[in-house]
Amino acid sequence: MSDNRVYSYSAVLMGSPILLKLYSHDEALASRVFQLIKRYEDLLTVNRAESQVMDINHAAGRHPVTVSRPVFQLIQCAKAASMVRDSAFNLAIGPLVKLWRIGFHGHSVPDAADIRARLALTRPQEVILDETTCSVFLQQPGMELDLGAIAKGYIADRVRDYLRQQQVEKALINLGGNVHTLGEWTIGLKKPFADAQALIGSLTINGQSVVTSGTYERYFEQDGKRWHHILDPRSGYPLDNELDSVTVISTDSLDGDIWTTLLFGLGVEKGCAALRQREDIDAIFVTKNRDIILSSPQRLRFSPLDSGYQVIDCTA
C-alpha cells in the first residue's frame, strides 16, 4: 500500500548503478525487478564470455546462431536503425568499440590503418537475419555485434511492462542514462563536464522515458584532445560536432536509445528537421557553446537551472 513516501532500491547491474523508486515499501518487488534486469543482461551483454550475443560473435564468418525471440527482435530493430541512410547508429560497431577501449583500461588513439581495417568489419548489411529460424549470421570473420547503445532502453521497457503487470501506478527506474517512469516525475539534466550533482535544468514527464547520451560520460585525453565514447561508424572516430549531449523524451526507452545516437550523428539543424516528422519524440540538445535547444518548447516541461546556459527553440 502506498503511503506517499518514495522508497529507493539500488543495485549494480550492466556496469552501472541501477535505481528503482516506488511509492510503497516492497523489497520483494524490487528484488524481482533486479532479477529481471539481470536475466536480460545475461542475454545481451558483450562484456563477458557467454551470452546469446557473444554466441553470435564467436560464430562470425562460420555459421548462423539461433537465439531467443526477444534477442532476435532487438537485433532486428537495431539493424533497421543501422540501415537508415547516413545513420550514426550501427549494431555491428563492436570491432571499433574494442579497438578504442574507451572506458576500459589501456585506451589510446588507434592507428588510422587499424581504424580502416575495423571499419570494413562494421557493415550492418552483412548481419543476416532469418525470421523463420530466429537465427543471426555475421558474414565476415571478425565481425561483432555490440548492442550497448540499445540494450538499456530495451530492458527499461521490459521493467516498465513488468511494473504495469504488477499494478504499480507510480515508479521510476534509472538504468544509468535511461530513465523510465510510471506516473509523473521531475528529473534533473546533468551539466556536462561538471560535478555529478550539477544540473542545467529539470524536466517533468508523465509515463515517459528520458534517455541522455553525452560526450562527458566516458572519455580520455590524449595529445591535448578529448576522445569520447560516442563513435561515428562512418569515420571510425568519436563524433565531432557542436554537441555535448542529447536527451530524448519518448514513450519507449528503446526509441530513446536509437534517437539519441541518430540525433548525435545528425547535429542540431538536421536533428531538429528530423524531429518535425515525429510528434511522438522530443529532444533537448546541449551544445558546446552552452545553448540548450528544445525541439518542442510547447510540449516539453523544462525548467532551466543554470544561468550560464541559454534556452532556445529548435525553430529559432
Swiss-Prot record:
Amino-acid positions noted as binding Mg(2+) in the UniProt annotation, renumbered to this chain: A149, D257, T261
Cofactor: Mg(2+)
Effect of deleting the gene: Inactivation of this gene results in a complete loss of the fumarate reductase activity displayed by KPK_2907, which contains a covalently bound FMN, but does not affect the Na(+)-NQR activity.
Source taxon at top rank: Bacteria
Keywords: Cytoplasm, FAD, Flavoprotein, Magnesium, Metal-binding, Transferase
A UniProt-annotated Pfam family: ApbE
Gene3D superfamilies: ApbE-like domains
Chief place where the protein resides: cytoplasm
Record localization: Cytoplasm
Catalytic activity line of the entry: L-threonyl-[protein] + FAD = FMN-L-threonyl-[protein] + AMP + H(+)
InterPro entries (alphabetical): ApbE, ApbE-like_sf
EC number in record: 2.7.1.180
Binding site for FAD: M14, A88, F89, N90, D146, K152, L231
A molecular function (GO) term: transferase activity
GO cellular component term of the entry, any: cytoplasm
UniProt function note: Flavin transferase that catalyzes the transfer of the FMN moiety of FAD and its covalent binding to the hydroxyl group of a threonine residue in a target flavoprotein. Is responsible for the modification of the fumarate reductase KPK_2907.
Family the UniProt entry places it in: Belongs to the ApbE family.
The protein, known as: FAD:protein FMN transferase
Naturally occurring in which organism (per UniProt): Klebsiella pneumoniae (strain 342)
